[in-house]
């Protein structure tokens, strides 16, 4: 067993105890009862919804280039030769391997060749699924859904169990809370006999400025998940993919608790809108390049989530301190009247987010 502590978090590896998870991360945070996932409005998001999967992102695909970066790994001393043999043994003969080890374990190089290949290798066999422990946040809707996408809500325990049942418990790690820190401190590889803790550490630390996300993560581990080198700046290596679906993590479709559409989703750039009454609106997607995803989305909701639909809203909220503007969501009813035509009905059941 190895142990690492940083910023109030404890990272523990259990390589020799098969009765325990390979890695345990204790952030002294209570797991939320519900977690949410925000989606922008595009074909990939709709496919993920209707096929009940999350895309487990490669670090190159994250919106913070410091997130899970190889720069979060460093050394203050030489690494054991066994690490080089395990990583480079099939690529170099013994003489070249010894030469690489000697050069790489200098103060100037600081094991950069090892760190680079180690990171590239593990990034091909893991992916990150980011969720939020907050049902509402004034920044999450514009940042991740552009106020036009949608949000899914899950019971945390149901989601964890569902993903583990679908892809195998040994391929799922987490749910872990993110360790938000004032500074990004790289972890010293030379302090560890195995590199499980350094790997999970680099996937778990973010600057405190991101703490508004209240992020919780699954780490998915599979073979040949792929490395999208083309998404890395100035990188000339070709993308490596066997099957993009290796980055999909499926869940049971019936565990979605709610779907909330963004406040700006329904507008006249997307729909012909007929206000039948204050409560009832008829929607017809406008034929254009985007209309197909709107049809697929509303068909799916009306067939599978019609009793779980909400719409993001805004109201004036009166209190002893005066009037303020707050976000809300209102439960809606949806019926598919005919092909490409939908009836949306307000229920006036409004949830406030102060």
Stretches with model-predicted labels:
Residues 1-354:
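Partner-binding and oligomerization surfaces adjacent to conserved cores of proteins
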């Amino acid at each position: 067993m190895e142990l690492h502590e940083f910023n109030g978090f404890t990272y523990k590896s259990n390589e020799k105890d098969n009765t325990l998870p390979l890695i345990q991360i204790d952030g002294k945070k209570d797991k939320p009862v519900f977690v949410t996932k925000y989606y922008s409005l595009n074909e990939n998001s709709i496919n993920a919804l209707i096929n009940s999967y999350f895309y487990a992102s490669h670090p190159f695909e994250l919106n913070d280039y410091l997130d899970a970066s190889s720069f979060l790994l460093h050394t203050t001393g030489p690494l054991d030769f066994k690490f080089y043999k395990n990583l480079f043994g099939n690529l170099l003969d013994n003489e070249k391997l010894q030469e690489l080890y000697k050069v790489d374990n200098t103060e100037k190089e600081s094991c950069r060749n090892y760190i680079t290949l180690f990171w590239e290798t593990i990034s091909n066999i893991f992916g990150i699924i980011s969720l939020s422990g907050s049902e509402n946040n004034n920044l999450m809707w514009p940042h991740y859904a552009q106020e036009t996408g949608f949000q899914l809500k899950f019971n945390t325990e149901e989601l964890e169990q569902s993903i583990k049942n679908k892809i195998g418990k040994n391929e799922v790690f987490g749910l872990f809370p993110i360790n938000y820190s004032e500074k990004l401190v790289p972890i010293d590889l030379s302090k560890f006999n195995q590199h499980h803790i350094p790997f999970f550490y680099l996937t778990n630390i973010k600057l405190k400025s991101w703490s508004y996300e209240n992020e919780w993560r699954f780490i998915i581990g599979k073979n040949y998940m792929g490395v999208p080198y083309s998404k890395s700046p100035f990188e000339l290596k070709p993308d490596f993919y066997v099957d993009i679906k290796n980055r999909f993590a499926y869940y049971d479709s019936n565990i979605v608790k709610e779907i909330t559409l963004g406040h700006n989703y329904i507008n006249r750039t997307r729909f012909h809108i007929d206000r039948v009454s204050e409560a009832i609106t008829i929607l017809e997607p406008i034929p254009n390049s985007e209309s197909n995803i709107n049809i697929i989305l509303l068909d799916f909701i009306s067939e599978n989530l019609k009793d779980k639909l909400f719409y993001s809203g805004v109201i004036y909220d009166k209190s002893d301190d005066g009037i303020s503007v707050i976000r809300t969501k209102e439960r809606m009813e949806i019926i598919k009247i005919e092909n490409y035509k939908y009836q949306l009905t307000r229920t006036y059941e409004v949830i406030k987010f102060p």
